[in-house]
Amino acid sequence: MGLVNQQLQHALKEWAIAVDALSTGKTIVLLRKGGIREAGFQVQQPLVWLYPTYEHQKPHLLKPEYASKVTPVKSGWHPQTVIIKSCAEITQVLPVSSKEQIEALQPYHIWHEQMISDRLGWQPQRPLIVLLLRVYRLAIPKTILYDSSYGGCKSWIDLIEPISQDNLNPVISDDEYAIQAQKIAALVSAKFNDK
């Protein structure tokens, strides 16, 4: 990865359950449309820390194997400290706009099909964005203090203090990542060509 001894401040906010799935190699996929206050989803930085969020996680929006791992929290709740355990390189950004594309991707993400269908239907003029992430774990996770600038319905934040990228290890092998990424990109392309 060639990032030893560099500092990184940029972070992508995502449900804690999704960050866990990415950080343990269970998925390489995130699906985004952007925060409510954003005009759409755009990748601002190709290399980011994964910042876990809790407020909008709902068990019924996840596949059963992930739903049982989520405890809903009250609106506005946030932890006093946040554990940053992984960094992601966003290797591909794939727009999808059809139900068929979404159905083809079902084995590769953690969300319940109804949640994905709802997200696709929200602001239908905007495509759903499939992000493929090459994830690296910190050998020792970094605990940071929560800051109010991290709150709100936005996808991207800058951490108050940058975190060193030293001691990052890939979650899955280069070969396994390449195989998964190729399969997912092919599914999206095949569905585009069917139109």
Each model region followed by its residue ranges:
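Structured alpha/beta reader/binder surfaces that contact nucleic acids or chromatin modification marks
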Residues: 2-195
